[in-house]
UniProtKB/Swiss-Prot annotation:
GO terms for molecular function: ATP binding; glycerol kinase activity. Keywords: ATP-binding, Glycerol metabolism, Kinase, Nucleotide-binding, Transferase. Pathway: Polyol metabolism; glycerol degradation via glycerol kinase pathway; sn-glycerol 3-phosphate from glycerol: step 1/1. Belongs to the FGGY kinase family. ADP binds at T13, R17, T267, G310, G411, N415. This is Glycerol kinase. It is an enzyme of class 2 (transferase). The keyword Transferase applies. It comes from Carboxydothermus hydrogenoformans (strain ATCC BAA-161 / DSM 6008 / Z-2901). PANTHER family: GLYCEROL KINASE, SUGAR KINASE. Activated by phosphorylation and inhibited by fructose 1,6-bisphosphate (FBP). Homotetramer and homodimer (in equilibrium). GO terms for biological process: glycerol catabolic process; glycerol metabolic process; glycerol-3-phosphate metabolic process. It catalyses: glycerol + ATP = sn-glycerol 3-phosphate + ADP + H(+).
Length: 500
C-alpha cells in the first residue's frame, strides 16, 4: 500500500494530539483530548503517565477511525512533547513508581538552592547550557529517588528507568523494547553535557542518579525502532522523529540557518534562535540548548522563555472579567490608538528570560483618571510584544547576530493588532505561516526525513508558506520611547515579594 502520510504525536502540557500530514505538508486530520492536571500541594504539578499514554493512544485510534486511515499508509511516526516533565518507571513491570513531575512544578526549588550554595551555577551553565532551576528534569529525578519508598534501592539495582515524555511514549509504543531520547530533550535535563554530547557523570554523582536509569541519546531524525504490532493495530511502523516542543516548532518553521528565529505565543512565550554549530554561552539570562541532531551533526539554539504571555489574556477574561473571550482582546484594544501611557508587567509567576527574577510580581503602572478598560486590554496585549523584545535584545547581544525577520506561531498569532505591534516594537518584519501547527509539523518533518518520505531540508523550505508578513511602520523615536517606558515599568515589578 502507498505510504501517504506521516503521523505526528504532539504530547502537550494540557492535551494529547495526533495530527496526520500528507506529502505537501497539509494537515489531513487532527484528534485531541485533554487530560487531568494534579496539584497535590501549592506549586506542585503532576500528570499520571498512564493517563498520558491512554489519552495519546486514544487520539491516535480516534484519528485513524475518523479519517479512515489504514496504518499501512503511514510512512513514519514523529513525537514532540512537553519538555522536562519527568517519568520514572519500573523496567520489569513497566509501571511508573510515581506520577510524572511536570516542568511547571516548583517542589525541587530547595534542591536547586543547595546546588547554588555549593557554587555549581557556572559549572551547570557551562556543561548543560541551563540555569539551575526546578524547571529542569535533574532535580525532579532526585526528588523521586529520595521521596518514593524503595525507589533509590531499585534504581541502584538497575531496575528503574527515567525518561522525559518522548521516552515514555516510545517505550509504550514499542512494547517496552526501546529506551531512547533525542538530543533536544536530553539537553533539557540539566544532567546532559551539550558540548561532549553525553550524560555528565559529575552532575549525575552530584544528584545521586544512577546512569543505568538513563535513555540512550540519538539524533532527532533517526529510526529508533518500530511500533509493536500488538500495540499499534497489527502494524510495525517506524518511529523516526523526536524533538522537544519548542525545538520541533523551530524545525517546523524551517529555521535551518544560523540567525533564524521563531517565537511561539502560547500560555507563555518561547523564543528560539538557531546558532548552528556554535555553543554561545549566554551572558544575558538565556538558555543554550540543542536544537536538534540531524544528518550526522548537532545544531544549537539560544532560548528565552517568557512565563506569562497568552495567560495574561486569560486573566483579563477569567480574573478581571474585562473580556468574554480571548478573541475580544483585539476588538477592545483597537478601540484606542495606544495604551494612554499604561503598562502591564504580567510577572504573575516571576519573570523569566532575561531577568530570571522569581520574586517579581505583576504590576500595572501609568494609570490616570482617563484610563479605561480598552487601555488595559491593549496594555496586556502589548506586554507580550515587549517581553519578546527583551528576549530578542538578549539574543542579539549573546550571538552578535542581527535578526532579519521573526517567524511566529501559537494561538495568539491570530491577533493582527498584536502581530503589527510586535513588528513595530522590534523594528523587523514578523512572518505568520499558513500552517500554525508548526510544533507537530516539525515532528512530522524529522520523522519523514529519516525514512525518505521527504528528500531533504530544501524540499521543506520550498513548502513553507507565509500567510501574512507584518512590516514595521513605527518610527524609531516612538519605538524607543515606548520601550524605555516598558523598561521603567519592569523595574517597578522586580523583587516585589519579600521573604518572610
Amino acid at each position: 500500500m502507498t505510504k501517504k502520510y506521516v503521523l505526528a504525536l504532539d504530547q502537550g502540557t494540557t492535551s494529547c494530539r495526533a495530527i496526520l500530514f500528507d506529502r505537501d505538508s497539509n494537515i489531513v486530520g487532527v484528534a485531541q483530548k485533554e487530560f487531568t492536571q494534579h496539584y497535590p500541594k501549592p506549586g506542585w504539578v503532576e500528570h499520571d503517565p498512564e493517563e498520558i499514554w491512554s489519552t495519546q493512544y486514544g487520539v491516535i485510534a480516534e484519528l485513524m477511525a475518523r479519517y479512515n486511515v489504514n496504518p499501512e499508509e503511514i510512512a513514519a511516526i514523529g513525537i514532540t512533547n512537553q519538555r522536562e516533565t519527568t517519568v520514572v518507571w519500573d523496567r520489569n513491570t513497566g509501571k511508573p513508581v510515581y506520577n510524572a513531575i511536570v516542568w511547571q512544578c516548583r517542589r525541587t526549588a530547595g534542591i536547586c538552592d543547595e546546588l547554588k550554595a555549593k557554587g555549581l551555577e557556572e559549572k551547570v551553565r557551562y556543561k548543560t547550557g541551563l540555569v539551575i532551576d526546578a524547571y529542569f528534569s535533574g532535580t525532579k529525578i532526585k526528588w523521586i529517588l529520595d521521596n518514593v519508598e524503595g525507589a533509590r534501592e531499585k534504581a541502584e539495582r538497575g531496575e528503574l528507568l527515567f525518561g522525559t515524555i518522548d521516552t515514555w511514549l516510545v517505550w509504550k509504543l514499542t512494547g517496552g523494547k526501546v529506551h531512547v531520547t533525542d538530543y533536544s530533550n536530553a539537553s533539557r535535563t540539566m544532567i546532559y553535557n551539550i558540548r561532549e554530547l553525553k550524560w555528565d557523570e559529575e552532575l549525575l554523582a552530584e544528584l545521586g542518579i544512577p546512569a543505568s536509569m538513563l535513555p540512550e541519546v540519538k539524533p532527532s531524525s533517526y529510526v529508533y525502532g518500530e511500533t509493536d504490532p500488538n500495540v499499534f493495530f497489527g502494524h510495525a511502523i517506524p518511529i523516526s522523529g523526536i524533538a522537544g516542543d519548542q525545538q520541533a516548532a523551530l524545525f517546523g518553521q524551517t529555521c535551518f540557518e544560523p540567525g533564524m528565529a521563531k517565537n511561539t505565543y502560547g500560555t507563555g512565550c518561547f523564543m528560539l534562535m538557531n546558532t548552528g554549530d556554535k555553543v554561545y554561552e549566554s551572558k544575558n539570562g538565556l538558555l543554550t540548548t540543542i536544537a536538534w541532531g540531524i544528518d550526522g551533526k548537532v545544531e544549537y539554539a539560544l532560548e528565552g522563555s517568557i512565563f506569562i504571555a497568552g495567560a495574561v489574556i486569560q486573566w483579563l477574561r477569567d480574573g478581571l472579567k474585562l473580556i468574554e473571550s480571548a478573541a475580544d482582546s483585539e476588538y477592545f484594544a483597537s478601540k484606542v490608538p495606544d495604551t494612554g501611557g499604561v503598562y502591564i508587567v504580567p510577572a504573575f509567576a516571576g519573570l523569566g528570560a532575561p531577568y530570571w527574577d522569581m520574586r517579581a510580581r505583576g504590576t500595572i503602572v501609568g494609570l490616570t483618571r482617563g484610563t479605561n478598560k480598552y487601555h488595559l486590554v491593549r496594555a496586556a496585549l502589548e506586554s507580550m510584544a515587549y517581553q519578546t523584545r527583551d528576549v530578542l535584545s538578549a539574543m542579539e547581544a549573546d550571538s552578535g547576530i542581527k535578526l532579519q525577520a521573526l517567524k511566529v506561531d501559537g494561538g495568539a498569532v491570530a491577533n493582527n493588532l498584536l502581530m503589527q505591534f510586535q513588528a513595530d516594537i522590534l523594528g523587523v518584519p514578523v512572518e505568520r505561516p499558513v500552517n500554525i501547527e508548526t510544533t507537530a509539523m516539525g515532528a512530522a518533518y524529522l520523522a519523514g526525513l529519516a525514512v525518505g518520505f521527504w528528500a531533504d531540508k530544501q524540499e521543506l523550505v520550498a513548502k513553507y508558506k507565509v500567510s501574512r508578513r507584518f512590516e514595521p511602520t513605527m518610527d524609531e523615536q516612538t519605538r524607543e520611547k515606548l520601550y524605555k517606558g516598558w523598561q521603567r515599568a519592569v523595574t517597578r515589578a522586580r523583587e516585589w515579594e519579600v521573604e518572610e
